[in-house]
């Protein structure tokens, strides 16, 4: 059984690049959701800063494999190339260690 990884990505966008950041990211998310290692992702907008997008992602691979392979996929090249110009500060990854999981119980 493959161990899943989960992480949070913070994308603090420039106010003038809000729509471009969002539309560029959606294209990447649409493509990455077809990857065999992909489990899920949830895109959020920060309640404190509407220019900041936050992703919660889960993948069925190691963190090292994700960084070495998934960030270099052809469909990400354009996005990764222009990302720095869309952000007011650097993108950050927050890696998570699962402590315990809960799922809704059907009644």
Question: Regions from the language model: what does each represent?
Answer:
Residues 6-9, 13, 28, 100-101:
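Small-side-chain structural scaffolding
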Residues 16-17, 47, 75:
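Alpha-helical structural elements of signaling/regulatory helical domains
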Residues 5-12, 40-71:
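Short, well-ordered beta-strand segments in beta-rich or mixed alpha/beta enzyme
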Residues 12-22:
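Short, surface-exposed ligand-recognition loops at beta-strand->loop->(often short) alpha-helix junctions
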